[in-house]
């Protein structure tokens, strides 16, 4: 299996304490999603991997709904940390505001959901 040099960097970053959203951006079809799937396959952190490919651009609420799903799964698994990965996030209108709102809510409530966003 081919691993990009960024593989080890991302693998390391998701094990660090939650303090930054990890953003992976680049041209289409260069292997961003594949690399993240490889990292997740080697990680022991419970995760939810989603894609916004088929989400209507105006459905900004989808981000909050998926974040709630991640919170529920984290609670159900009684996990100390959880990883939410959203691929193609740039396809959703006002995605950055929605992500910031949920990130800030988790920061305030001391919820340990780490986030990886992918987009072109």
Positions of predicted regions on the chain:
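Phosphate-binding site recognition
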Residues: 1-120
């Amino acid at each position: 299996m081919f691993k990009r040099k960024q593989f080890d960097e991302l693998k390391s970053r998701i094990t660090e304490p939650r303090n930054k959203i990890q953003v992976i951006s680049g041209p289409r079809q260069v292997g961003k999603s594949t690399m993240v799937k490889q990292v997740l396959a080697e990680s022991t952190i419970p995760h939810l991997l989603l894609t916004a490919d088929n989400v209507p651009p105006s459905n900004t609420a989808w981000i909050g709904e998926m974040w709630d799903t991640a919170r529920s799964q984290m609670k159900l698994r009684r996990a100390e940390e959880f990883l939410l990965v959203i691929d193609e996030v740039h396809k959703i209108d006002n995605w950055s505001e929605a992500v910031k709102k949920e990130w800030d809510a988790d920061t305030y409530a001391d919820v340990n959901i780490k986030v990886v966003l992918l987009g072109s």
